[in-house]
Amino acid sequence: MEDYKAFLDEKMSKVLLSLDNEYKTLRTGRISSNVFDKIFIQYHGQKTPITQVSSIRIPEARLVVIQPWDKTILNKIEQAILNSDLSMNPSSDGSVIRIKVPALTSERRQDIVKHAKKIAEEHKVSTRNIRQDLNNKVKKQEKESEITEDSLKRILDDIQKSIDIYIKRIDTILESKIQEIMEV
């Protein structure tokens, strides 16, 4: 099981990428077009993200302009934004949607921080599940006499040290995101 480090690194890079993608969709003090990544509309019979059917620009710090490529879906996009958990109120002039983004209240910031912590914890659980799977594979090899008991202990220690490093990295990413959310 010499390739356990490569296996662990591959799995953990996917966990960290997933964490990063989830955090991109959280609203922070600065508005980003990524907050619209998880807003979908029905388009040609399929659930489609609004980011794939429109251009999203942020000309000012608190203004978002969404221009659908097909004007017939303007109302669908507007409704999807209203029905989302972003607490935004879009207005349409018939060709583009403008959203004046209000500053986040401290209560809303706390809710977003709570959600960010929940996301981090879910990713830590994924990390621990990866550790458990890897530990089981290594223990199975020891039972089948593919590796010695000393090798087993060394490998399990290495796995635990690597997992600890990845958990610290998740905590660091969380702290950075919390600072970004709380920034006024």
Curated annotation (Swiss-Prot):
Alphabetically ordered keywords of this record: Cytoplasm, Protein biosynthesis
Biological process, per Gene Ontology: translational termination
GO molecular function annotations of the record: ribosomal large subunit binding
Primary location class: cytoplasm
Assigned GO CC terms: cytoplasm
SUPFAM superfamilies reported for this sequence: Ribosome recycling factor, RRF (SSF55194)
Domain of life: Bacteria
InterPro entries: Ribosome_recyc_fac (IPR002661), Ribosome_recyc_fac_dom (IPR023584), RRF_sf (IPR036191)
Record localization: Cytoplasm
Family of this protein: Belongs to the RRF family.
HAMAP family with a match to the protein in the record: RRF (MF_00040)
NCBIfam families, per database record: frr (TIGR00496)
Protein name: Ribosome-recycling factor
Organism: Borrelia garinii subsp. bavariensis (strain ATCC BAA-2496 / DSM 23469 / PBi) (Borreliella bavariensis)
